[in-house]
Curated annotation (Swiss-Prot):
GO biological process: protein refolding
HAMAP family attached to this UniProt entry: CH60 (MF_00600)
The protein, known as: Chaperonin GroEL
Any GO CC annotation of this UniProt entry: cytoplasm
Similarity comment text for this entry: Belongs to the chaperonin (HSP60) family.
Keyword Nucleotide-binding set for record: yes
Lineage: superkingdom: Bacteria
Keyword GTP-binding attached: no
Role summary: Together with its co-chaperonin GroES, plays an essential role in assisting protein folding. The GroEL-GroES system forms a nano-cage that allows encapsulation of the non-native substrate proteins and provides a physical environment optimized to promote and accelerate protein folding.
Protein backbone atom coordinates (compact mmCIF):
# COMPACT_ATOMS: atom_id res chain seq x y z
CA UNK A 1 0.00 0.00 0.00
CA UNK A 2 1.37 3.42 -0.95
CA UNK A 3 1.99 6.02 1.75
CA UNK A 4 1.30 9.71 2.12
CA UNK A 5 3.87 11.79 4.01
CA UNK A 6 3.59 15.23 5.59
CA UNK A 7 6.51 17.18 7.03
CA UNK A 8 7.20 19.81 9.67
CA UNK A 9 4.38 22.28 10.39
CA UNK A 10 2.00 20.58 7.92
CA UNK A 11 2.33 17.31 9.85
CA UNK A 12 1.94 18.89 13.29
CA UNK A 13 -0.98 21.09 12.21
CA UNK A 14 -2.84 18.10 10.76
CA UNK A 15 -2.37 16.15 14.01
CA UNK A 16 -3.45 19.21 16.01
CA UNK A 17 -6.76 19.26 14.16
CA UNK A 18 -7.38 15.68 15.29
CA UNK A 19 -6.32 16.50 18.85
CA UNK A 20 -8.77 19.41 18.93
CA UNK A 21 -11.67 17.31 17.62
CA UNK A 22 -11.16 14.63 20.28
CA UNK A 23 -10.34 17.00 23.16
CA UNK A 24 -13.24 19.35 22.37
CA UNK A 25 -15.59 16.35 22.50
CA UNK A 26 -14.18 14.96 25.75
CA UNK A 27 -13.68 18.19 27.72
CA UNK A 28 -17.40 19.05 27.70
CA UNK A 29 -17.78 16.33 30.37
CA UNK A 30 -15.34 17.90 32.89
CA UNK A 31 -16.52 19.05 36.31
CA UNK A 32 -19.77 18.85 38.31
CA UNK A 33 -21.71 20.62 35.56
CA UNK A 34 -20.11 18.65 32.73
CA UNK A 35 -22.38 17.37 29.97
CA UNK A 36 -22.89 13.84 28.66
CA UNK A 37 -21.82 12.45 25.29
CA UNK A 38 -23.98 9.94 23.38
CA UNK A 39 -22.04 7.16 21.65
CA UNK A 40 -23.56 5.07 18.88
CA UNK A 41 -22.92 1.35 19.35
CA UNK A 42 -22.82 -1.28 16.62
CA UNK A 43 -25.64 -3.11 18.41
CA UNK A 44 -28.04 -2.31 21.22
CA UNK A 45 -28.98 1.10 22.56
CA UNK A 46 -26.59 4.09 22.42
CA UNK A 47 -24.25 4.60 25.39
CA UNK A 48 -24.66 7.85 27.33
CA UNK A 49 -21.51 8.63 29.31
CA UNK A 50 -19.24 11.34 30.69
CA UNK A 51 -16.24 9.02 31.02
CA UNK A 52 -13.32 10.53 29.11
CA UNK A 53 -11.50 7.36 28.12
CA UNK A 54 -14.70 5.64 26.94
CA UNK A 55 -15.45 8.59 24.64
CA UNK A 56 -11.85 8.86 23.40
CA UNK A 57 -11.72 5.19 22.41
CA UNK A 58 -14.84 5.57 20.24
CA UNK A 59 -13.49 8.42 18.09
CA UNK A 60 -12.20 7.49 14.63
CA UNK A 61 -11.54 10.27 12.09
CA UNK A 62 -11.65 9.92 8.31
CA UNK A 63 -8.45 11.90 7.70
CA UNK A 64 -5.48 9.62 8.57
CA UNK A 65 -3.27 12.46 9.83
CA UNK A 66 -6.00 13.91 12.04
CA UNK A 67 -6.81 10.42 13.29
CA UNK A 68 -3.20 9.89 14.39
CA UNK A 69 -3.37 13.06 16.49
CA UNK A 70 -6.64 11.93 18.03
CA UNK A 71 -5.24 8.45 18.76
CA UNK A 72 -2.19 9.91 20.54
CA UNK A 73 -4.48 11.83 22.91
CA UNK A 74 -6.65 8.74 23.32
CA UNK A 75 -3.47 6.94 24.37
CA UNK A 76 -2.89 9.59 27.07
CA UNK A 77 -6.39 8.96 28.41
CA UNK A 78 -5.92 5.17 28.32
CA UNK A 79 -2.52 5.34 30.04
CA UNK A 80 -3.90 7.58 32.79
CA UNK A 81 -6.85 5.22 33.21
CA UNK A 82 -4.51 2.20 33.46
CA UNK A 83 -2.31 3.86 36.11
CA UNK A 84 -4.86 5.75 38.21
CA UNK A 85 -8.28 4.58 36.98
CA UNK A 86 -9.60 8.13 36.62
CA UNK A 87 -8.53 11.62 35.49
CA UNK A 88 -8.76 10.81 31.79
CA UNK A 89 -10.61 14.01 30.88
CA UNK A 90 -8.11 16.14 32.81
CA UNK A 91 -5.24 14.40 30.99
CA UNK A 92 -6.91 15.13 27.64
CA UNK A 93 -7.43 18.82 28.48
CA UNK A 94 -3.81 19.20 29.62
CA UNK A 95 -2.47 17.50 26.47
CA UNK A 96 -4.48 19.79 24.20
CA UNK A 97 -3.32 22.90 26.09
CA UNK A 98 0.38 21.95 26.07
CA UNK A 99 0.41 20.95 22.38
CA UNK A 100 -1.56 24.04 21.31
CA UNK A 101 0.77 26.49 23.08
CA UNK A 102 3.83 24.50 22.03
CA UNK A 103 2.87 24.55 18.34
CA UNK A 104 2.43 28.35 18.44
CA UNK A 105 6.01 28.71 19.66
CA UNK A 106 7.48 26.10 17.29
CA UNK A 107 5.74 27.80 14.34
CA UNK A 108 7.25 31.11 15.50
CA UNK A 109 10.73 29.59 15.26
CA UNK A 110 11.41 28.05 18.69
CA UNK A 111 13.45 24.84 18.94
CA UNK A 112 11.00 21.97 19.69
CA UNK A 113 13.70 19.96 21.49
CA UNK A 114 14.34 22.82 23.91
CA UNK A 115 10.61 23.28 24.46
CA UNK A 116 10.21 19.58 25.17
CA UNK A 117 13.00 19.72 27.81
CA UNK A 118 11.25 22.67 29.44
CA UNK A 119 7.90 20.84 29.44
CA UNK A 120 9.45 17.74 31.03
CA UNK A 121 11.27 19.83 33.68
CA UNK A 122 8.12 21.78 34.55
CA UNK A 123 5.97 18.64 34.72
CA UNK A 124 8.49 16.92 36.98
CA UNK A 125 8.57 19.96 39.32
CA UNK A 126 4.77 20.30 39.40
CA UNK A 127 4.35 16.57 40.12
CA UNK A 128 6.75 16.85 43.08
CA UNK A 129 4.68 19.78 44.37
CA UNK A 130 1.43 17.77 44.03
CA UNK A 131 2.98 14.90 46.00
CA UNK A 132 3.96 17.35 48.77
CA UNK A 133 0.39 18.69 48.95
CA UNK A 134 -1.11 15.19 49.28
CA UNK A 135 -3.00 14.42 52.49
CA UNK A 136 -3.17 10.72 53.52
CA UNK A 137 -6.63 9.12 53.44
CA UNK A 138 -7.65 6.74 56.19
CA UNK A 139 -11.16 7.51 57.45
CA UNK A 140 -14.42 6.49 55.84
CA UNK A 141 -15.69 10.06 55.31
CA UNK A 142 -12.64 11.05 53.21
CA UNK A 143 -13.07 7.94 51.06
CA UNK A 144 -16.75 8.80 50.58
CA UNK A 145 -15.79 12.34 49.50
CA UNK A 146 -13.42 11.07 46.81
CA UNK A 147 -16.01 8.63 45.44
CA UNK A 148 -18.75 11.29 45.54
CA UNK A 149 -16.67 13.83 43.59
CA UNK A 150 -15.66 11.23 40.99
CA UNK A 151 -19.19 9.89 40.43
CA UNK A 152 -21.13 13.10 41.20
CA UNK A 153 -23.36 10.99 43.44
CA UNK A 154 -23.44 10.89 47.26
CA UNK A 155 -25.17 7.51 47.11
CA UNK A 156 -22.28 6.02 45.11
CA UNK A 157 -19.86 7.60 47.60
CA UNK A 158 -21.63 5.75 50.42
CA UNK A 159 -21.53 2.39 48.61
CA UNK A 160 -17.81 2.66 47.84
CA UNK A 161 -16.82 3.85 51.34
CA UNK A 162 -18.92 1.10 52.97
CA UNK A 163 -17.33 -1.52 50.74
CA UNK A 164 -13.77 -0.32 51.41
CA UNK A 165 -14.41 -0.11 55.15
CA UNK A 166 -15.62 -3.72 55.25
CA UNK A 167 -13.05 -5.41 52.99
CA UNK A 168 -10.02 -3.14 53.57
CA UNK A 169 -7.62 -1.63 51.04
CA UNK A 170 -6.42 -5.10 49.99
CA UNK A 171 -9.94 -6.44 49.52
CA UNK A 172 -11.57 -6.89 46.14
CA UNK A 173 -14.57 -4.77 45.15
CA UNK A 174 -16.32 -5.91 42.00
CA UNK A 175 -19.15 -4.26 40.09
CA UNK A 176 -21.97 -6.35 38.64
CA UNK A 177 -25.31 -5.68 37.02
CA UNK A 178 -28.27 -6.19 39.35
CA UNK A 179 -31.41 -7.99 38.24
CA UNK A 180 -33.54 -5.33 39.92
CA UNK A 181 -33.72 -1.53 39.89
CA UNK A 182 -31.97 -1.01 43.22
CA UNK A 183 -28.20 -0.73 43.68
CA UNK A 184 -27.02 -2.99 46.51
CA UNK A 185 -23.81 -3.86 48.34
CA UNK A 186 -23.05 -7.50 49.11
CA UNK A 187 -19.96 -8.34 51.19
CA UNK A 188 -18.42 -11.80 51.63
CA UNK A 189 -16.06 -11.94 54.60
CA UNK A 190 -13.44 -14.65 54.88
CA UNK A 191 -12.24 -16.92 52.08
CA UNK A 192 -14.82 -17.99 49.54
CA UNK A 193 -14.32 -20.19 46.49
CA UNK A 194 -16.76 -21.41 43.88
CA UNK A 195 -17.10 -25.06 44.78
CA UNK A 196 -20.15 -26.57 46.52
CA UNK A 197 -20.89 -29.82 48.36
CA UNK A 198 -20.49 -33.07 46.43
CA UNK A 199 -23.74 -34.48 47.82
CA UNK A 200 -26.91 -32.69 48.91
CA UNK A 201 -27.22 -35.23 51.73
CA UNK A 202 -24.37 -33.37 53.45
CA UNK A 203 -26.49 -30.28 54.19
CA UNK A 204 -27.33 -29.46 57.81
CA UNK A 205 -29.90 -26.74 57.08
CA UNK A 206 -32.47 -28.31 54.74
CA UNK A 207 -34.53 -25.12 54.52
CA UNK A 208 -31.63 -23.12 53.03
CA UNK A 209 -29.88 -26.21 51.59
CA UNK A 210 -26.65 -25.19 53.31
CA UNK A 211 -24.07 -27.19 55.26
CA UNK A 212 -22.88 -25.26 58.32
CA UNK A 213 -19.81 -26.44 60.23
CA UNK A 214 -18.82 -24.83 63.53
CA UNK A 215 -15.16 -25.01 64.54
CA UNK A 216 -14.33 -27.59 61.85
CA UNK A 217 -11.13 -29.38 60.99
CA UNK A 218 -10.20 -28.89 57.32
CA UNK A 219 -8.46 -31.60 55.29
CA UNK A 220 -6.67 -30.02 52.30
CA UNK A 221 -5.27 -32.27 49.58
CA UNK A 222 -4.66 -32.27 45.84
CA UNK A 223 -5.42 -36.00 45.67
CA UNK A 224 -8.56 -37.83 44.57
CA UNK A 225 -10.12 -39.80 47.44
CA UNK A 226 -11.76 -42.97 46.11
CA UNK A 227 -11.01 -45.48 48.87
CA UNK A 228 -12.30 -44.74 52.38
CA UNK A 229 -9.38 -46.74 53.81
CA UNK A 230 -7.04 -43.89 52.75
CA UNK A 231 -8.56 -41.49 55.28
CA UNK A 232 -9.95 -43.97 57.83
CA UNK A 233 -7.11 -43.47 60.38
CA UNK A 234 -7.66 -39.70 60.20
CA UNK A 235 -11.45 -40.04 60.54
CA UNK A 236 -10.99 -42.13 63.69
CA UNK A 237 -8.84 -39.37 65.23
CA UNK A 238 -11.42 -36.68 64.34
CA UNK A 239 -14.26 -38.83 65.74
CA UNK A 240 -12.61 -38.70 69.17
CA UNK A 241 -12.65 -34.86 69.13
CA UNK A 242 -16.37 -34.71 68.25
CA UNK A 243 -15.67 -31.90 65.74
CA UNK A 244 -16.94 -31.62 62.13
CA UNK A 245 -14.70 -32.10 59.09
CA UNK A 246 -14.51 -30.22 55.81
CA UNK A 247 -12.69 -32.13 53.05
CA UNK A 248 -11.19 -30.06 50.21
CA UNK A 249 -9.81 -32.53 47.64
CA UNK A 250 -9.31 -32.98 43.91
CA UNK A 251 -12.41 -35.18 44.07
CA UNK A 252 -14.19 -37.62 46.36
CA UNK A 253 -15.77 -40.55 44.53
CA UNK A 254 -15.90 -44.36 44.42
CA UNK A 255 -16.86 -45.95 47.73
CA UNK A 256 -15.52 -43.00 49.72
CA UNK A 257 -18.36 -40.57 48.96
CA UNK A 258 -21.33 -42.86 49.82
CA UNK A 259 -19.52 -44.02 52.98
CA UNK A 260 -19.07 -40.43 54.16
CA UNK A 261 -22.71 -39.59 53.30
CA UNK A 262 -24.00 -42.67 55.16
CA UNK A 263 -22.04 -41.77 58.30
CA UNK A 264 -23.31 -38.19 58.05
CA UNK A 265 -26.96 -39.34 57.77
CA UNK A 266 -26.55 -41.76 60.69
CA UNK A 267 -25.08 -38.95 62.79
CA UNK A 268 -21.76 -40.73 63.35
CA UNK A 269 -19.91 -37.55 62.44
CA UNK A 270 -20.53 -34.30 60.56
CA UNK A 271 -18.57 -34.20 57.30
CA UNK A 272 -18.80 -32.17 54.08
CA UNK A 273 -16.68 -32.78 50.97
CA UNK A 274 -15.99 -30.23 48.22
CA UNK A 275 -13.75 -30.17 45.17
CA UNK A 276 -10.60 -28.05 45.28
CA UNK A 277 -10.92 -24.63 43.60
CA UNK A 278 -9.15 -23.63 40.38
CA UNK A 279 -7.13 -25.66 37.92
CA UNK A 280 -3.47 -26.53 37.38
CA UNK A 281 -0.94 -24.21 39.00
CA UNK A 282 -3.69 -21.87 40.21
CA UNK A 283 -5.30 -24.78 42.11
CA UNK A 284 -1.98 -25.54 43.78
CA UNK A 285 -1.56 -21.87 44.79
CA UNK A 286 -5.14 -21.59 46.11
CA UNK A 287 -4.78 -24.75 48.19
CA UNK A 288 -1.57 -23.35 49.69
CA UNK A 289 -3.42 -20.07 50.45
CA UNK A 290 -6.18 -22.06 52.17
CA UNK A 291 -3.64 -24.05 54.19
CA UNK A 292 -1.86 -20.88 55.38
CA UNK A 293 -5.17 -19.19 56.24
CA UNK A 294 -6.36 -22.15 58.32
CA UNK A 295 -3.00 -23.23 59.78
CA UNK A 296 -2.99 -26.57 57.97
CA UNK A 297 -0.80 -28.35 55.43
CA UNK A 298 -1.57 -29.34 51.85
CA UNK A 299 -1.28 -33.13 51.78
CA UNK A 300 0.44 -33.73 48.48
CA UNK A 301 2.94 -36.20 47.07
CA UNK A 302 5.14 -33.24 46.08
CA UNK A 303 5.89 -32.81 49.79
CA UNK A 304 6.12 -36.57 50.36
CA UNK A 305 2.88 -36.64 52.37
CA UNK A 306 0.30 -39.43 52.28
CA UNK A 307 -3.33 -39.36 53.41
CA UNK A 308 -2.88 -42.61 55.40
CA UNK A 309 -0.20 -40.97 57.55
CA UNK A 310 -2.02 -37.65 58.08
CA UNK A 311 -2.57 -36.50 61.67
CA UNK A 312 -4.71 -33.79 63.25
CA UNK A 313 -1.68 -31.45 63.19
CA UNK A 314 -1.80 -31.45 59.37
CA UNK A 315 -5.41 -30.25 59.30
CA UNK A 316 -6.50 -26.66 59.06
CA UNK A 317 -9.04 -25.13 61.44
CA UNK A 318 -11.56 -22.29 61.30
CA UNK A 319 -14.28 -20.72 63.42
CA UNK A 320 -16.92 -21.57 60.83
CA UNK A 321 -17.37 -23.02 57.35
CA UNK A 322 -20.50 -22.65 55.23
CA UNK A 323 -21.09 -24.70 52.08
CA UNK A 324 -23.96 -24.39 49.62
CA UNK A 325 -24.40 -26.04 46.22
CA UNK A 326 -22.08 -23.51 44.51
CA UNK A 327 -19.82 -21.92 47.11
CA UNK A 328 -17.66 -22.68 50.15
CA UNK A 329 -16.92 -19.91 52.66
CA UNK A 330 -14.37 -20.23 55.46
CA UNK A 331 -14.45 -17.61 58.23
CA UNK A 332 -11.72 -16.85 60.79
CA UNK A 333 -9.07 -19.35 59.78
CA UNK A 334 -6.66 -20.43 62.52
CA UNK A 335 -3.48 -19.63 60.54
CA UNK A 336 -0.74 -17.56 62.17
CA UNK A 337 -0.76 -13.82 61.49
CA UNK A 338 2.93 -13.87 60.49
CA UNK A 339 2.44 -16.68 57.97
CA UNK A 340 -0.54 -14.91 56.41
CA UNK A 341 1.40 -11.61 56.25
CA UNK A 342 4.32 -13.33 54.53
CA UNK A 343 1.96 -14.93 52.02
CA UNK A 344 0.29 -11.56 51.35
CA UNK A 345 3.70 -9.97 50.71
CA UNK A 346 4.58 -12.70 48.19
CA UNK A 347 1.29 -12.22 46.31
CA UNK A 348 1.76 -8.43 46.25
CA UNK A 349 5.23 -8.91 44.76
CA UNK A 350 3.75 -11.19 42.08
CA UNK A 351 1.11 -8.54 41.27
CA UNK A 352 3.87 -5.97 40.74
CA UNK A 353 5.83 -8.24 38.42
CA UNK A 354 3.05 -9.70 36.24
CA UNK A 355 2.34 -8.18 32.83
CA UNK A 356 -0.92 -10.10 32.28
CA UNK A 357 -4.16 -8.33 33.24
CA UNK A 358 -5.86 -11.71 33.76
CA UNK A 359 -3.09 -12.96 36.07
CA UNK A 360 -3.16 -9.66 37.96
CA UNK A 361 -6.92 -9.96 38.50
CA UNK A 362 -6.61 -13.54 39.80
CA UNK A 363 -3.72 -12.57 42.11
CA UNK A 364 -5.76 -9.67 43.50
CA UNK A 365 -8.64 -12.05 44.19
CA UNK A 366 -6.27 -14.35 46.11
CA UNK A 367 -4.89 -11.36 48.01
CA UNK A 368 -8.38 -10.22 48.96
CA UNK A 369 -9.36 -13.65 50.25
CA UNK A 370 -6.30 -13.74 52.49
CA UNK A 371 -6.15 -10.12 53.62
CA UNK A 372 -9.66 -8.71 53.44
CA UNK A 373 -12.76 -9.95 51.73
CA UNK A 374 -14.81 -9.53 48.60
CA UNK A 375 -17.48 -6.85 48.14
CA UNK A 376 -19.87 -6.82 45.20
CA UNK A 377 -21.68 -3.62 44.21
CA UNK A 378 -24.76 -4.74 42.29
CA UNK A 379 -25.82 -1.84 40.07
CA UNK A 380 -29.52 -1.40 39.38
CA UNK A 381 -31.29 1.03 37.03
CA UNK A 382 -34.58 1.52 35.21
CA UNK A 383 -33.15 1.12 31.69
CA UNK A 384 -30.18 -0.62 30.09
CA UNK A 385 -28.76 2.75 28.96
CA UNK A 386 -28.89 4.16 32.49
CA UNK A 387 -27.41 0.92 33.85
CA UNK A 388 -24.35 1.13 31.57
CA UNK A 389 -23.77 4.79 32.45
CA UNK A 390 -24.15 4.08 36.18
CA UNK A 391 -21.73 1.17 35.98
CA UNK A 392 -19.05 3.35 34.36
CA UNK A 393 -19.55 6.03 37.03
CA UNK A 394 -19.12 3.54 39.86
CA UNK A 395 -16.03 2.00 38.23
CA UNK A 396 -14.44 5.47 37.99
CA UNK A 397 -15.35 6.24 41.60
CA UNK A 398 -13.88 2.94 42.78
CA UNK A 399 -10.63 3.51 40.89
CA UNK A 400 -10.35 7.07 42.19
CA UNK A 401 -10.88 5.86 45.75
CA UNK A 402 -8.16 3.22 45.46
CA UNK A 403 -5.80 5.85 44.07
CA UNK A 404 -6.63 8.17 46.99
CA UNK A 405 -5.89 5.46 49.56
CA UNK A 406 -2.59 4.76 47.79
CA UNK A 407 -1.14 8.29 47.47
CA UNK A 408 -3.50 10.62 49.35
CA UNK A 409 -5.76 13.46 48.23
CA UNK A 410 -5.32 17.06 47.04
CA UNK A 411 -7.70 19.97 46.47
CA UNK A 412 -10.12 19.10 43.69
CA UNK A 413 -11.62 21.03 40.82
CA UNK A 414 -8.21 21.63 39.22
CA UNK A 415 -7.14 23.75 42.21
CA UNK A 416 -4.12 21.57 43.03
CA UNK A 417 -2.75 22.04 39.49
CA UNK A 418 -3.02 25.83 39.80
CA UNK A 419 -1.43 25.72 43.27
CA UNK A 420 1.48 23.74 41.77
CA UNK A 421 2.32 26.71 39.49
CA UNK A 422 4.09 28.36 42.44
CA UNK A 423 6.72 25.61 42.34
CA UNK A 424 7.54 26.58 38.73
CA UNK A 425 8.51 30.10 39.86
CA UNK A 426 11.67 28.58 41.35
CA UNK A 427 12.79 27.36 37.92
CA UNK A 428 15.00 29.75 36.00
CA UNK A 429 16.16 28.55 32.60
CA UNK A 430 17.07 30.26 29.36
CA UNK A 431 15.63 30.38 25.87
CA UNK A 432 13.36 27.63 24.64
CA UNK A 433 13.61 25.60 27.87
CA UNK A 434 12.03 28.52 29.76
CA UNK A 435 9.41 28.75 27.01
CA UNK A 436 8.53 25.09 27.66
CA UNK A 437 8.18 25.83 31.40
CA UNK A 438 5.85 28.76 30.62
CA UNK A 439 3.75 26.52 28.37
CA UNK A 440 3.13 24.11 31.27
CA UNK A 441 2.44 27.07 33.58
CA UNK A 442 -0.38 28.17 31.26
CA UNK A 443 -1.65 24.61 30.69
CA UNK A 444 -2.01 23.94 34.44
CA UNK A 445 -4.80 26.54 34.51
CA UNK A 446 -6.76 24.88 31.71
CA UNK A 447 -8.77 22.31 33.76
CA UNK A 448 -10.11 25.09 36.03
CA UNK A 449 -10.99 27.22 32.99
CA UNK A 450 -12.85 24.29 31.43
CA UNK A 451 -14.71 23.34 34.63
CA UNK A 452 -15.83 26.97 34.96
CA UNK A 453 -16.87 27.18 31.30
CA UNK A 454 -18.92 23.98 31.57
CA UNK A 455 -20.72 25.50 34.56
CA UNK A 456 -21.49 28.72 32.65
CA UNK A 457 -18.75 30.95 34.11
CA UNK A 458 -15.93 32.85 32.41
CA UNK A 459 -12.77 30.80 32.93
CA UNK A 460 -10.37 33.77 32.81
CA UNK A 461 -12.26 35.58 35.59
CA UNK A 462 -12.18 32.48 37.81
CA UNK A 463 -8.43 31.95 37.19
CA UNK A 464 -7.61 35.61 37.99
CA UNK A 465 -9.38 35.34 41.35
CA UNK A 466 -7.92 31.89 42.08
CA UNK A 467 -4.37 33.24 41.69
CA UNK A 468 -4.98 35.69 44.53
CA UNK A 469 -6.61 33.16 46.87
CA UNK A 470 -4.64 31.24 49.49
CA UNK A 471 -3.53 27.68 48.75
CA UNK A 472 -6.40 25.19 49.10
CA UNK A 473 -9.17 27.68 48.33
CA UNK A 474 -10.95 27.03 45.08
CA UNK A 475 -14.10 27.55 43.05
CA UNK A 476 -17.00 25.18 43.65
CA UNK A 477 -18.54 25.08 40.18
CA UNK A 478 -21.59 23.21 41.49
CA UNK A 479 -22.64 26.10 43.78
CA UNK A 480 -20.69 29.06 42.35
CA UNK A 481 -18.99 29.68 45.72
CA UNK A 482 -15.35 30.08 46.79
CA UNK A 483 -14.57 27.50 49.46
CA UNK A 484 -11.78 25.57 51.15
CA UNK A 485 -11.81 22.58 48.82
CA UNK A 486 -10.56 19.99 51.33
CA UNK A 487 -13.01 21.08 54.06
CA UNK A 488 -15.85 21.13 51.53
CA UNK A 489 -15.00 17.57 50.44
CA UNK A 490 -14.07 18.59 46.89
CA UNK A 491 -10.96 16.47 46.52
CA UNK A 492 -9.04 14.54 43.89
CA UNK A 493 -6.63 11.64 44.40
CA UNK A 494 -3.02 12.88 44.15
CA UNK A 495 -2.21 9.85 41.98
CA UNK A 496 -4.90 10.79 39.46
CA UNK A 497 -3.78 14.43 39.27
CA UNK A 498 -0.07 13.73 38.88
CA UNK A 499 -0.64 10.84 36.41
CA UNK A 500 -2.76 13.10 34.19
CA UNK A 501 0.01 15.73 34.11
CA UNK A 502 2.86 13.25 33.59
CA UNK A 503 1.16 11.46 30.70
CA UNK A 504 0.00 14.70 29.06
CA UNK A 505 3.51 16.21 29.20
CA UNK A 506 5.08 13.02 27.85
CA UNK A 507 2.88 12.72 24.76
CA UNK A 508 2.78 16.49 24.12
CA UNK A 509 6.59 16.55 24.04
CA UNK A 510 6.61 13.74 21.49
CA UNK A 511 4.07 15.48 19.26
CA UNK A 512 5.99 18.78 19.31
CA UNK A 513 9.23 17.06 18.26
CA UNK A 514 7.53 15.22 15.39
CA UNK A 515 9.00 16.25 12.02
CA UNK A 516 7.27 13.81 9.67
CA UNK A 517 4.04 11.81 9.70
CA UNK A 518 3.52 8.79 7.46
CA UNK A 519 -0.03 7.62 6.75
CA UNK A 520 -1.67 5.10 4.45
CA UNK A 521 -2.99 6.65 1.25
CA UNK A 522 -6.76 6.23 0.90
CA UNK A 523 -7.61 3.44 -1.52
CA UNK A 524 -9.17 4.78 -4.75
CA UNK A 525 -12.83 3.93 -5.02
CA UNK A 526 -13.56 0.92 -7.23
CA UNK A 527 -15.14 1.93 -10.58
CA UNK A 528 -18.88 1.49 -10.65
CA UNK A 529 -20.30 -1.33 -12.78
CA UNK A 530 -21.82 -0.02 -16.06
CA UNK A 531 -25.59 -0.39 -16.32
CA UNK A 532 -26.70 -3.61 -17.97
CA UNK A 533 -28.04 -3.43 -21.54
CA UNK A 534 -31.66 -4.62 -21.39
CA UNK A 535 -31.21 -6.42 -24.70
CA UNK A 536 -28.53 -8.68 -23.17
CA UNK A 537 -28.99 -11.74 -20.98
CA UNK A 538 -32.71 -12.22 -21.42
CA UNK A 539 -32.69 -13.41 -25.06
CA UNK A 540 -33.80 -16.95 -24.24
CA UNK A 541 -37.03 -15.83 -22.61
CA UNK A 542 -40.24 -15.48 -24.64
Amino acid sequence: MSKEIKFSSDARTAMMRGIDILADTVKTTLGPKGRNVVLEKSYGSPLITNDGVTIAKEIELEDHFENMGAKLVSEVASKTNDIAGDGTTTATVLTQAIVREGLKNVTAGANPVGIRRGIELAAETAVASIKEMAIPVHDKSAIAQVATVSSRSEKVGEYISDAMERVGSDGVITIEESKGMQTELDVVEGMQFDRGYLSQYMVSNTEKMVAELDNPYILITDKKISNIQEILPLLEQILKTNRPLLIVADDVDGEALPTLVLNKIKGVFNVVAVKAPGFGDRRKAQLEDLAILTGGTVITEELGLDLKDATLEALGQAAKATVDKDHTTIVEGAGSVDAISDRVAIIKAQIEKTTSDFDREKLQERLAKLAGGVAVVKVGAATETELKAMKLLIEDALNATRAAVEEGIVSGGGTALVNAIAALDKLSEEGDIQTGINIVRRALEEPVRQIAANAGYEGSVIIDKLRSEKVGTGFNAATGQWVNMIEEGIVDPAKVTRSALQNAASVAGLILTTEAVVANKPEPAAPAMPPMDPSMGMGGMM
